[in-house]
Amino acid sequence: YLETITWSFTDEKINNKFKEKLESVKIINPISSDLNVLRNSLYPNLIFYLEKNLNRGFGDQAIFEIGPTFTGKKPGQQKTVVCGIKKQFIDEDNSSKNKNLIDVFHIKKDLVQSLTELGIEKDEFIVEDNTPSYYHPGISGSVVSIDGNFVLGNFGALHPKIISNTFGFEIFLENLVDYKSKNIKIKESLTFSDYQKSDRDFAFL
């Protein structure tokens, strides 16, 4: 994956496809007509640049971004998300020299590996099929903490009405931190004796 840094603004038309039930935060004086709302998801901007790269002749695409998303106008209604997106192909198979289409298992592997790097082990989460509407039903999943209290991320094929043959994943860093803070194992404090240390050397005949 190549890292991408984009605006926190995006086009309201594409943002509406990803906002679900969230509130659109409109900008009073946007710098451009296609950057007129704060993004509810990182996907709109990633899709924009992915398609732009494809139009310039770049074939395989795998890009990601770490940045803020906005769920409302009030203070604190901002979330930090890791989002990655892949288009169409993976690396060539050295044995057959043919390119293999990406499937949901490839993007799931990317998500699981990312969670592992962030300190979440495989036995700390389960996969459910309750994903947002911008994912393809049946070709996507939601990663939920083992206690069922936190949605750590989503992965899968993006809905073909939005973009075809494209897979992505999201990791919600605040949820990850909240889960870890509530399930951290604290070691017992080390207790020292009030008495001086002494050693004895016994010899028996």
Regions found by a protein language model. Give the residues of each.
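Extended beta-strand-rich architecture
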Residues: Y1-L205
